[in-house]
Amino acid sequence: MCSVPRGNGVWAALRAFWAALTSYRADLRYPLFWQGLESLFTSETKAWKVTERLCTRLSFFLADNAQTQQDLFDKANICYDTRSKIIHGRWQPGTEINQPMADTEATVRTVVRHLLERPGMIGAFVSPKRDDFLDAWVQSKAFTPPPFTP
């Protein structure tokens, strides 16, 4: 992790994840986890359909088949909706945060594990070509990453 260069989505994500992990209150932790996921999976230049793009990219990154991809997309959409409620002041404290928090924490753990374990993933995600790489992955509808040329 010390080898991750600064000034890219991976660095921003790691900082957000660290801030989330060292926070206690759910309404502060939860958006930080999603800030990190947004740093990894949203576009730096395309500001339209952010939720759809985030959920699609995230679900293809994590899935190994079509059913899992759809399930992960749906779960990410629900969790991102919770993030939006918190950010926009519509969230009410209570136990309904427990499941989205558990799902989000599991997603973050799995994303970080895949970034570290899959050969070339850190390189692809710190690259200025990350957006093209993720678009190619989603367009391929494959459950393995496309070739990446730095």
Locate the predicted segments by residue.
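Amphipathic, oligomerization/interface secondary-structure segments
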Residues: 1-150
